[in-house]
Amino acid sequence: MELVPWTSFARIVRRHGGDVGVRTLSCAEQFRAMAFAQLTWRESLRDIEVSLSANAGKLYAMGFRSAVRRSTLADANESRDWRIWSDLAAVLIRRARKLYLGDSVLGVELDNTVYALDSSTIDLCLSLFSWAPFQSTKAAIKLHTLLDLRGAIPAFIHISDGKLHDVNVLDMLVLEPGAFYVMDRGYLDFQRLHAMTQAGAFFVTRAKSPMDARRVYSAPTDRSTGIISDQQVMLNGHYSAKKYPQHLRRIRFKDLESGKTLIFLTNHMALPALTIAALYKSRWQVELFFKWIKQHLRIKHFMGNSENAVKTQVWCAVATYVLIAIVKKELQLDASLYTCLQILSVSVFEKTQLSCALQADLSRSDPPDLANQLNLFNF
């Protein structure tokens, strides 16, 4: 917890009135309890209460003024504005993005910022989470994430019910001129893509089939690389042509490994076609991010049923993930993010400095990776 920006956090709490009228379990203590649950894989409020009570003599050193009761923690998760935790996560994300500025996971040399945009669905029980409708028989929330591919740090996260269509998230983004936004075809909306072009941003996505467009120009290609065609096109459809009245670049690419043929659309006319294909391939990194946090953090089983409690738990999980990434970078650790998480999970009650605890554990042999554990970009 020593790396949490507590001064900034105090301002956030004051802004949202988080500690107004609070006698026990301040917002800072609430975050410590929820982060403890993430680091040590606690599955319920009772689990948190019992685990902390078993170490009652060490609670003060962890920042707790008194024992944590599950009823008090439940009330806090239900009533305190979830935006406290989203704002804290935003502060941590800004810090982490600066630390990972030069750590690109792209397979190409590119000066531009590259983002991967996608969503992941977390299924819920409709009778318990009626505020998050998805299908007729079940509920769900969606985790919409814009991942900065320089270090796999989320630059934007939005939590919605399961019915929100992915394409609507494009309206929420603050577009960065010169940046690339890599998306699957679920985000294909020509009016919104044209807004990206007007904002000076670039996109790489896949075309839907069939696509009504006429060829304007064809560039020479080397089919041995997998590039079948590289064309500039204009949309023919009555409505689509009005929504996107400029040239689009359409690249037909055959993946030499899988044999699949993919059609990419982009508004960048100068990059080599193979680079565009490599950028789209990098979109898989956001899928790895979702798999990692679902496997290693507590966001599949919730400790409260209300919208506020669920968002509180998810945002605390995101903040914990980013904190671990910050620890790894600031201490210049060579271990994976999962290894750092393992070490922190067994040393949360230790009074030694965090850097000493991590360095001491890593000086020994790394714990063996289990076969079903994901390594996220060597994190």
Feature-to-residue mapping (PLM):
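Single, function-defining residue in the core of a domain
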Residues: 1-47, 51, 80, 87-88, ...
